Amino acid sequence: MSRPGTYVIGLTLLVGLVVGNPGCPRSYRPLTLDYRLNPVAVIGDSYTTGTDEGGLGSKSWTARTWQMLAARGVRIAADVAAEGRAGYGVPGDHGNVFEDLTARAVQPDDALVVFFGSRNDQGMDPEDPEMLAEKVRDTFDLARHRAPSASLLVIAPPWPTADVPGPMLRIRDVLGAQARAAGAVFVDPIADHWFVDRPELIGADGVHPNDAGHEYLADKIAPLISMELVG
């Protein structure tokens, strides 16, 4: 998908402040507005696509995040490639893994690539943990190759209760190790207790966020993206 070209418009407004009577000299304060578009790619699963439980269209965490950032003066040109049931090593509804989605979404001028997920990698062979590590490494390598100057933000999958199954912890640990090896910023929602004791944020299926859950995700993720783009 093509995205609008990045451009910068520097606009300086001179604001006159009158001191005393009209005959007095005026002082001026320059105001600079920065209209850069920050190109960002997002790779994810059904937590990003949204589901019947919530988060479809403008109610997705991505759409909410772009709105929140725009309100803070950070404008985003995004390519979002997400697929239900997909992971780094497990194909999704249309047969794609995260590496395929990376090839589709990441562009040479990207400033940031965000990876979110995936709990779907529980479906990989637990007897061969190196297979997942290899899939993750290949995905990050592809992102680096396609967007050499981009920062990578890797967000491991959350779990909605404090009782986290072993396979999820292994996925988290693999992602953390590979993110550090790739020089990426790693975020651990399990350690940070995202969604824990917040059942009102999860849909009736007990798995996917509802609309309020997507708003919660945007509140968590928008500052992370802002930090990578503007510090």
Swiss-Prot record:
Temperature and thermostability: Optimum temperature is 40 degrees Celsius (with pNP-decanoate as substrate).
Q: Which GO terms describe its molecular function?
A: carboxylic ester hydrolase activity
> Which principal EC class is assigned to this enzyme?
hydrolase
Keyword set for this entry? Cell wall, Hydrolase, Lipid degradation, Lipid metabolism, Secreted, Serine esterase, Signal
Where is this protein found? Secreted, Cell wall; Secreted, Extracellular space
- From the UniProt record, list the reaction(s) this protein catalyses: a fatty acid ester + H2O = an aliphatic alcohol + a fatty acid + H(+); decanoate ester + H2O = decanoate + an aliphatic alcohol + H(+); an octanoate ester + H2O = an aliphatic alcohol + octanoate + H(+); a dodecanoate ester + H2O = an aliphatic alcohol + dodecanoate + H(+)
One GO CC term on file: extracellular region
- Per its UniProt record, what InterPro entries does this chain match? GDSL_Rv0518, GDSL_Rv0518-like, SGNH_hydro, SGNH_hydro_sf
How does activity track with pH? Optimum pH is 9.0 (with pNP-decanoate as substrate).
User: Which N-terminal residues, if any, form the signal peptide?
Assistant: 1-20
The record, for Gene3D superfamilies, names:
SGNH hydrolase
How is activity regulated here?
Answer: Activity is inhibited by the serine modifier phenylmethylsulfonyl fluoride (PMSF).
The Gene Ontology biological process terms listed for this entry are: lipid catabolic process
Q: Which residues form the active site?
A: S46 (nucleophile), D205 (proton donor), H208 (proton acceptor)
Site Transition state stabilizer: give positions.
G87, N120
Gene induction: Expression is up-regulated under nutrient starvation (in strain H37Ra).
UniProt similarity note: Belongs to the 'GDSL' lipolytic enzyme family.
Q: What else is known?
A: Expression in M.smegmatis alters colony morphology and growth kinetics, provides resistance to SDS, lysozyme and anti-TB drugs, increases the total lipid content and trehalose dimycolates, and enhances infection ability and intracellular survival capability of M.smegmatis.
Q: Which NCBIfam families match?
A: GDSL_lipase
Q: What is this protein called?
A: GDSL lipase Rv0518
